[in-house]
Amino acid sequence: MDSPPKLTGETLIVHHIPLVHCQVPDRQCCGGAGGGGGGTRANPFCPPELGLTQPDHDLGQADSLLYPSLHSAPGAPTGSSDSVKSRSRDGRGPGAPKRHNPFLVQEGVGETGLGDLHDSSTGDSVTQQSFHLHSASQPFHLSSFQLPPSGPGQGRPWGATHSRPGVVEGQEQDPATALGTQCSTSHCCRPELEAERMELDECGGHGGSGSGGGTSDISGFSFEQEWKISSDESPRHPGRSGSGTQHCHCSSTSSQSEAADQSMGYVSDSSCNSSDGVLVTFSTLYNKMHSSSRANLNSVPQSCSDSSFCSHADPGAFYLDLQPSPAESRMSCESHHPENGDREEGCGCPHVSSPELDANCNAYHPHSEPCPAVADLTACFQSQARLVVATQNYYKLVTCDLSSQSSPSPAGSSITSCSEEHTKISPPPGPCPDPDPNQPSEYYLFQKPDIQPEEQEAVGSPAEAATAMGPTVLEGQVYTNTSPPNLNTGRQRSRSYDRSLERSPPVRLGSLERMLSCPVRLSEGPAALAGPASPPRRVTSFAELAKGRKKAAGSGSPPLRASVGDSSQEFSPIQEAQQDRAAPLDEGTRCSHSLPSLPLGPSLDLLGPEPWSTPVCQGSQSSEMPLPSLRAAGQGPLAQLMDPGPAFSGSPATSHTQRDSRARADGGGTESRPVLRYSKEQRPTTLPIQPFVFQHHFPKQLAKARALHSLSQLYSLSGCSRAQQPAPLVISTAQGPAPAPSGEPQPFTSQASGRGARNAGPEPETSRPSPLGSYSPVRSAGPFGSSTDSSASTSCSPPPEQGTAADSVSPWSHTCPPTVRPATSQQPPKEDQKIPTLAEYRLHGTGSLPPLGSWRSGFTRAESLVRGGGEGSMANRPNNANHLSPQALKWREYRRKNPLGPPGLSGSLDRRPPEARLARRNPIFEFPGSFGTTSHLNCRLNGQISKPLSLTCPDLQDPFSLTEKPPAEFCLSPDGNSEAISIDILQKKGLVKAVNTAVDLIVAHFGTSRDPGVKAKLGNSSVSPNVGHLVLKYLCPAVQAVLEDGLKAFVLDVIIGQRKNMPWSVVEASTQLGPSTKVLHGLYNKVSQFPELTSHTMRFNAFILGLLNIRSLEFWFNHLYNHEDIIQTHYQPWGFLRAAHTVCPGLFEELLLLLQPLALLPFSLDLLFQHRLLQSGRQQRQHKELLRVSQDLLLSAHSTLQLARSRGQEGPGDMDRVAPGERVKGVGASEGGEEDEEDAEEVAVVAGSSDHGKWARGGQAGWWYQLMQSSQVYIDGTAEGSRFPRSSSSSSGSGSEKKKGVGSGGPSQAPPPPPREGVVEGAEACPAPEEALGQERGWPFWMGSPPDSVLAELRRSREREGPVAPPTENEEGTAEPSPGGIKWGHLFGSRKSQREARPTNRLPSDWLSLDKSVFQLVAQTMGARREPEPRENLQESHPPAVPSKPPCEVQALCHHLATGPGQLSFHKGDILRVLGPARGDWLRCSRGPDTGLVPLAYVTLPPTPSSPPGSSQN
């Protein structure tokens, strides 16, 4: 903190807030930090333990109370600002206890005043674990409070913004830098700016006094106070503590572009350096301030001070105004701090009422904000929101040589020092230090008037916002991202941030949800946050930044705005921020623009009217009122909910006058302003979720994306257009004060009136799509999702309920924690007043918010969607898409479009827990006064601040989900949801998802190698058939499903009348010869000429293969899409391709995006691939069939022979019993294959015929057996494993055939038979015996050893079999075959009897190859049992064994006289004992004592198996 001296000029802390951070939540945090209500919230930049001590908290509350007066008097005397500033420097107010330095590691160490902090920043910094930049003493707070008029961050919970949970440290740093630059630009100047700056300070002072008020003097940061507050808030709202100060700075610092960067970079910690500047998290800031020169915000700003840094922040960063003089910074901190104190006392939202922060994070006093309590509440809520985003908040420190200006905010400015995690826990507001009254509240890059338009035009530029809205109501919006992606920064951040805060555990919503949380409504925190932060714009100069912002917001802005649009719903604050930027013109306006401050919670409450309510509450419109409520909610989502009054201090009923003051400062015109946040076109095109990617390049990408009109952007644009009609206010807001009047402008205009020029100025920024918008729940009337949409809807034709109550409340709910909403309910009158505005605001800013609950309950989700919320959301989302990576973009767009279904459905589809919770909470927070508005706001605020709250509100299920789903719907059918046709968006999304899956698989197939040569081979279906299989199995069906969706059954043909319609008909129609279809036509002709392609489906698939070869699949789809005549002719209105022109253009864009990668792959597919595949398949089947038939014949013959043989051998009883079973099995196996065999085996097991079956049923053995059996499915590859289970069941199961199991098992197992090709594994005879043995001796390697019980059972079965088998196996070789004859062995001829090895391995081909008849084979097998040659001695030696093998006997079929030497003569019916096979067709047999050769054809198996072995007659 000792680096403040380093700041020769103003240090702008640019708060880069990921989409989430861009939202008001940061400010909320700030408010939370500042507000007593925020006590529970953890300091986003420092752990709760770093939070303020109770004294600090009290002081903060007192300050907050004092600050409300300042807040009400944005143009507070410079003198008071100076006094405050000096106090800030001193770090001690008259009675201000020292605040813990939020940047300090130790909690309570930072009790010293800012001055002390500064003086002992190095030493005390460590002691000041809490980033208490300001003295804890209330007087100090008061001073700080006074200062806010001078300081941009005077009352705004900018710290909250600073510490947006969604923003990464680096991001935060960037925003800090940007803020610094911005502040330096705007700091000098006007009282109004000063007031705005005060507001910033308020944000910072309250929530992040250190960040804002203390910014000027690093050692005298208001951080101490801020952090104290943060610490106090921290318990309640982890993200709120220290958010007050930070709010100011964070919000101001983070521009939307910056936010996008932060979103991308939030991943990295404080060390993250953005191209434009150093991204510093609160922790980093703290460390630097204490130990390193850069530790100070001032020092950091110095290092990062450069226009580029600011410009970088412009997209997603807020520029914190760092006052040059520590005293000033302290004063500003104190001025913030008093507000913080008030907030702490009054729900930590009094801060809301404190000076609002302009887009540049400069706090300006909302002219009509008398309610410090509101600010406190807002701060609390914001703190919570920021808690979520805090971890992702990065602060850019920019040092501007505005020494004449109030000293730059101390390093303590929350933006700079907020760490993402800390921010999330208790985002210390990064209020711009309240400069001395003489010092300008804000630094304007441009003259205040210029900045106003710029800000209005481009909320994206925090600097612009700050400049334009300098003293105006930038508090809620301070964090508003200037870059369209930063929509998240503004509103998004507040909502999602608040929601995140409520979920503060997920400090870093690196996840999409978190991004939505911030950028989207509070409930949608992650999505919203992600959007704005992701694509931070990097502009070298503020002017450039502002221009870029303007472009993003006003013109090409829709993509950017779309991103912001996401925010937009959540980003009403953005609009407010823009308004805030316009603050120089009209604080009220600014307040409106500050809608993002909603996430600020307290800032929203106090500044909420400015940032959130500002549009809703700040102006005379009810919108402003809700904003404070929202802000309160944002600041202390839960805590605020606990004290709705403080939460909604903005409302007259609320005790927090700051919020009211802020609303009043907004001129009470917040109502008109709330919805004006941004026009559809200005909504962020990029997807709010992207920010989590933290690709700082996205800002540039974003610009490119806008230029390119990425699919998502296009989608968002269409959605915006539709939304725009419903929400002209939003559009105007985005465009600027002038645009605001365009439709939605009216509500905002009212706000503008209330806020004055400020509203107009910042409105464009608000209009600019905020990350929130895209991701905010679309199903809520689209205020967020389709902020423009909602706005327009509200302004133009929002359903009264939804438009006013729902929309108004929704944005706040999204942005602010539930507390704010309760505040809203507290001030039903105000809400009523601002409800119209709020509804408008919600429509355009919280359009998707309406789905949140309360008002949602009042209005159907569809209604909300119809209002344009959905569309707005969608539009916003597409904008955010620009920030997304191509894949993310693709998915975002897909999601946006997919939500095309009913609003409710859409919400459900994309439902994110946060939003759902918010929706549920909505009812919880519904209050009699403004059930819709307040409830919704509360829900939203809480949702963003804390996901639990969002969970509570079913309608606010998830900002992202709501935004995603409804936007597609809304965008597609902004004019009343073409849903009249009842289009199933989910089903449409499923079609696109199928294509996505196919493309992913194909791309993965090619991704196996990077070598072009290898890739070419991978794409060649003849070399790598897999690619062809993937295309045929996945891509072709997916594409066909798309083309078949909604396909008419018949098409009218001039000649034949009705003609059946099918995808191929569409191909025909779309490939008619034309200037651009020569290639397609040629392909069509080629495919049509293949006679092999016999069906339309085959032709269609071949056509797809050809399109892949010529890399024209995407082109063909686009061509088809462009020919609406073809589509109308062939498709129903609800068909995918028809709906792509109406309800879900985004889905089609997503489809095209998904198909794009295929144009880059080297396909060389055979158009007849499918035909050849089918042909080969047929051939294989035929071959198998033939094989099976021949096998069956052989098996049947052999089984018959062997059955008789085995019967004869085993004896009537045993043989009969076993042989039939075996034979049946064998036949079954041969015919039915493995299944039959297994079935037979199972039967055997069940019958208990097999020991295996018995023990398999037993406990231990049972489980092992089951495991063994079930495992074979996975180990089919292993012959042993698969055979084992089967054989065990068949062998042991054939257990009845004990002999085979045991006797043959042994020999056959020795040489495991190789699996046979033609036979099913189970059909192999060998395996069975092997199995028996295998069980005992070797189980499959994968199985481990069988249980002892199994082994014992096996032994017993063997012993049992042994007795039987031994007789049969006098020679194992011969006996085995006959007993089990191995069940398969006997079927196939020779089992083990021939040779152990051979029988085991014997394949059908083996014996088929033997050129012998079946009988010959049978005889051979029988004889082979005695492998020994038919030697007589062997025969004689065998005779003893012969009886044991009855099967070796044959019966003479006729009389035969030996005609040659060695032949045997016999009579018909004689029983001959087979001694073995002889040559050719002869058997060596014995008849009594005589032996000789017998023609095989003359003998057959004895009819009676029981015939005695030796009964052969001579």
Curated annotation (Swiss-Prot):
Q: Where is the composition biased (Acidic residues)?
A: 1232-1242
Record-listed Phosphoserine modification sites: 534, 541, 557, 651, 776, 1378
> Residue spans with biased composition (Basic and acidic residues)?
1214-1225, 1353-1362, 1424-1435
The cross-references to SMART domains, in alphabetical order and at most eight, read: RUN, SH3
Q: Which Gene3D superfamilies does the annotation name?
A: 1.20.58.900, SH3 Domains
SUPFAM superfamilies the UniProt entry points to = RUN domain-like (SSF140741), SH3-domain (SSF50044)
Q: Does the keyword Phosphoprotein apply?
A: yes
**GO CC term, one of those recorded:** cytosol
Entry text on domains? The RUN domain is required for the interaction with RAB1A and RAB1B.
Briefly state the protein's biological role. Answer: Associates with the adapter-like complex 4 (AP-4) and may therefore play a role in vesicular trafficking of proteins at the trans-Golgi network.
* Protein name, as recorded: AP-4 complex accessory subunit RUSC2
Q: Which organism is it from?
A: Mus musculus
